[in-house]
Protein backbone atom coordinates (compact mmCIF):
# COMPACT_ATOMS: atom_id res chain seq x y z
CA UNK A 1 0.00 0.00 0.00
CA UNK A 2 3.00 2.32 0.32
CA UNK A 3 3.03 2.52 -3.49
CA UNK A 4 -0.65 3.55 -3.51
CA UNK A 5 0.15 6.22 -0.91
CA UNK A 6 2.90 7.67 -3.08
CA UNK A 7 0.70 7.66 -6.17
CA UNK A 8 -2.35 9.06 -4.34
CA UNK A 9 -0.56 11.92 -2.55
CA UNK A 10 -0.41 14.43 -5.45
CA UNK A 11 -4.04 13.72 -6.36
CA UNK A 12 -5.19 14.25 -2.77
CA UNK A 13 -3.17 17.46 -2.43
CA UNK A 14 -4.42 18.86 -5.73
CA UNK A 15 -8.03 18.04 -4.93
CA UNK A 16 -7.69 19.49 -1.44
CA UNK A 17 -6.19 22.71 -2.84
CA UNK A 18 -9.11 23.06 -5.23
CA UNK A 19 -11.57 22.27 -2.43
CA UNK A 20 -10.05 25.10 -0.37
CA UNK A 21 -10.46 27.53 -3.27
CA UNK A 22 -14.09 26.48 -3.77
CA UNK A 23 -14.86 26.25 -0.01
CA UNK A 24 -15.92 22.64 -0.51
CA UNK A 25 -13.56 20.78 1.84
CA UNK A 26 -16.22 19.00 3.90
CA UNK A 27 -18.67 18.24 1.08
CA UNK A 28 -15.93 16.76 -1.10
CA UNK A 29 -14.76 14.68 1.86
CA UNK A 30 -18.20 13.08 1.92
CA UNK A 31 -18.12 12.45 -1.83
CA UNK A 32 -14.66 10.91 -1.64
CA UNK A 33 -15.77 8.70 1.24
CA UNK A 34 -18.61 7.31 -0.88
CA UNK A 35 -16.33 6.81 -3.88
CA UNK A 36 -13.72 5.01 -1.78
CA UNK A 37 -16.36 2.69 -0.31
CA UNK A 38 -17.90 1.86 -3.69
CA UNK A 39 -14.52 1.15 -5.31
CA UNK A 40 -13.77 -1.43 -2.60
CA UNK A 41 -16.94 -3.42 -3.29
CA UNK A 42 -16.18 -6.68 -5.08
CA UNK A 43 -18.25 -6.20 -8.22
CA UNK A 44 -17.15 -2.60 -8.71
CA UNK A 45 -13.49 -3.49 -8.10
CA UNK A 46 -13.66 -6.21 -10.76
CA UNK A 47 -15.34 -3.77 -13.17
CA UNK A 48 -12.53 -1.26 -12.63
CA UNK A 49 -9.93 -3.93 -13.38
CA UNK A 50 -11.69 -5.03 -16.60
CA UNK A 51 -9.63 -3.82 -19.58
CA UNK A 52 -12.53 -4.14 -22.04
CA UNK A 53 -14.51 -1.41 -20.22
CA UNK A 54 -13.26 2.00 -21.33
CA UNK A 55 -12.30 4.76 -18.91
CA UNK A 56 -15.30 6.95 -19.64
CA UNK A 57 -17.73 4.08 -18.95
CA UNK A 58 -15.95 3.28 -15.67
CA UNK A 59 -16.13 6.93 -14.60
CA UNK A 60 -19.81 7.22 -15.56
CA UNK A 61 -20.70 4.05 -13.64
CA UNK A 62 -18.91 5.28 -10.50
CA UNK A 63 -20.45 8.74 -10.75
CA UNK A 64 -23.93 7.22 -11.12
CA UNK A 65 -23.43 4.68 -8.30
CA UNK A 66 -22.37 7.38 -5.86
CA UNK A 67 -24.75 10.00 -7.19
CA UNK A 68 -22.11 12.70 -7.59
CA UNK A 69 -23.54 16.11 -8.44
CA UNK A 70 -20.44 18.28 -8.03
CA UNK A 71 -18.79 19.11 -11.38
CA UNK A 72 -15.23 19.18 -10.03
CA UNK A 73 -15.57 15.83 -8.26
CA UNK A 74 -17.01 14.32 -11.44
CA UNK A 75 -14.04 15.69 -13.39
CA UNK A 76 -11.69 14.24 -10.77
CA UNK A 77 -13.21 10.77 -11.26
CA UNK A 78 -12.94 11.15 -15.04
CA UNK A 79 -9.25 12.11 -14.75
CA UNK A 80 -8.52 9.14 -12.46
CA UNK A 81 -10.35 6.79 -14.82
CA UNK A 82 -8.44 8.16 -17.81
CA UNK A 83 -5.16 7.53 -16.03
CA UNK A 84 -6.26 4.06 -14.85
CA UNK A 85 -6.02 5.17 -11.22
CA UNK A 86 -9.55 4.51 -9.89
CA UNK A 87 -8.21 1.80 -7.59
CA UNK A 88 -6.31 4.42 -5.55
CA UNK A 89 -9.51 6.23 -4.54
CA UNK A 90 -9.50 4.73 -1.00
CA UNK A 91 -5.95 6.03 -0.47
CA UNK A 92 -6.83 9.43 -1.98
CA UNK A 93 -9.73 9.59 0.47
CA UNK A 94 -7.48 8.68 3.42
CA UNK A 95 -4.92 11.33 2.51
CA UNK A 96 -7.60 13.95 1.80
CA UNK A 97 -9.08 13.16 5.21
CA UNK A 98 -5.64 13.66 6.83
CA UNK A 99 -5.27 17.00 5.03
CA UNK A 100 -8.72 18.03 6.27
CA UNK A 101 -7.86 17.12 9.85
CA UNK A 102 -4.57 19.01 9.62
CA UNK A 103 -6.34 22.04 8.11
CA UNK A 104 -8.75 22.01 11.06
CA UNK A 105 -5.86 21.53 13.54
CA UNK A 106 -7.05 18.05 14.50
CA UNK A 107 -4.89 14.94 14.69
CA UNK A 108 -6.05 11.42 14.05
CA UNK A 109 -5.51 8.89 16.85
CA UNK A 110 -6.08 5.15 16.90
CA UNK A 111 -6.55 3.36 20.21
CA UNK A 112 -5.85 -0.35 20.00
CA UNK A 113 -7.34 -2.36 22.83
CA UNK A 114 -7.35 -6.05 23.67
CA UNK A 115 -11.01 -5.74 24.67
CA UNK A 116 -13.93 -3.48 23.69
CA UNK A 117 -13.94 -0.11 25.46
CA UNK A 118 -17.03 1.62 26.82
CA UNK A 119 -17.95 5.12 25.65
CA UNK A 120 -16.99 6.41 29.10
CA UNK A 121 -13.52 4.80 28.86
CA UNK A 122 -12.98 6.22 25.37
CA UNK A 123 -14.07 9.67 26.61
CA UNK A 124 -11.65 9.56 29.56
CA UNK A 125 -8.83 8.38 27.30
CA UNK A 126 -9.65 11.15 24.82
CA UNK A 127 -9.33 13.81 27.55
CA UNK A 128 -5.97 12.42 28.70
CA UNK A 129 -4.65 12.05 25.15
CA UNK A 130 -5.77 15.56 24.14
CA UNK A 131 -3.66 16.92 27.02
CA UNK A 132 -0.74 14.57 26.34
CA UNK A 133 -0.53 15.44 22.64
CA UNK A 134 -1.61 19.08 23.14
CA UNK A 135 -4.09 18.81 20.31
CA UNK A 136 -7.68 17.94 19.56
CA UNK A 137 -7.81 14.30 18.48
CA UNK A 138 -10.20 12.41 16.24
CA UNK A 139 -10.20 9.01 17.91
CA UNK A 140 -11.00 5.62 16.47
CA UNK A 141 -10.85 2.36 18.42
CA UNK A 142 -9.71 -1.00 17.07
CA UNK A 143 -9.77 -4.32 18.90
CA UNK A 144 -6.52 -6.32 18.83
CA UNK A 145 -6.76 -9.38 21.12
CA UNK A 146 -3.04 -10.09 20.63
CA UNK A 147 -2.27 -7.10 22.91
CA UNK A 148 -3.35 -9.42 25.77
CA UNK A 149 -4.40 -6.44 27.92
CA UNK A 150 -4.02 -2.67 28.11
CA UNK A 151 -3.95 -0.31 25.14
CA UNK A 152 -1.68 0.99 22.42
CA UNK A 153 -2.20 4.49 20.98
CA UNK A 154 -0.94 5.81 17.65
CA UNK A 155 -1.04 9.53 16.88
CA UNK A 156 0.70 10.23 13.60
CA UNK A 157 4.14 8.65 13.89
CA UNK A 158 4.07 8.59 17.70
CA UNK A 159 3.20 5.36 19.52
CA UNK A 160 2.28 5.02 23.18
CA UNK A 161 2.35 1.29 24.02
CA UNK A 162 0.74 0.49 27.37
CA UNK A 163 -0.22 -3.06 26.43
CA UNK A 164 0.74 -6.25 28.23
CA UNK A 165 2.27 -7.49 24.98
CA UNK A 166 4.42 -4.35 24.76
CA UNK A 167 5.60 -4.73 28.34
CA UNK A 168 6.41 -8.44 27.80
CA UNK A 169 8.30 -7.56 24.64
CA UNK A 170 10.32 -4.90 26.50
CA UNK A 171 11.04 -7.38 29.30
CA UNK A 172 12.19 -9.99 26.78
CA UNK A 173 14.48 -7.46 25.09
CA UNK A 174 15.97 -6.42 28.44
CA UNK A 175 16.59 -10.02 29.49
CA UNK A 176 18.19 -11.10 26.20
CA UNK A 177 20.54 -8.13 25.82
From Swiss-Prot:
An example Gene Ontology CC term for this record: plasma membrane
Keyword terms, alphabetized: ATP synthesis, Cell inner membrane, Cell membrane, CF(1), Hydrogen ion transport, Ion transport, Membrane, Transport
A GO MF label: proton-transporting ATP synthase activity, rotational mechanism
Main localization, broad class: membrane
Gene3D superfamilies in the cross-refs: N-terminal domain of the delta subunit of the F1F0-ATP synthase (1.10.520.20)
Membrane topology recorded in Swiss-Prot or TrEMBL: Peripheral membrane protein
Cited Pfam families: OSCP
Cellular compartment(s): Cell inner membrane
Family under the similarity heading: Belongs to the ATPase delta chain family.
Function: F(1)F(0) ATP synthase produces ATP from ADP in the presence of a proton or sodium gradient. F-type ATPases consist of two structural domains, F(1) containing the extramembraneous catalytic core and F(0) containing the membrane proton channel, linked together by a central stalk and a peripheral stalk. During catalysis, ATP synthesis in the catalytic domain of F(1) is coupled via a rotary mechanism of the central stalk subunits to proton translocation. This protein is part of the stalk that links CF(0) to CF(1). It either transmits conformational changes from CF(0) to CF(1) or is implicated in proton conduction.
Subunit structure: F-type ATPases have 2 components, F(1) - the catalytic core - and F(0) - the membrane proton channel. F(1) has five subunits: alpha(3), beta(3), gamma(1), delta(1), epsilon(1). F(0) has three main subunits: a(1), b(2) and c(10-14). The alpha and beta chains form an alternating ring which encloses part of the gamma chain. F(1) is attached to F(0) by a central stalk formed by the gamma and epsilon chains, while a peripheral stalk is formed by the delta and b chains.
Protein name: ATP synthase subunit delta
Source species of the chain: Neisseria meningitidis serogroup C (strain 053442)
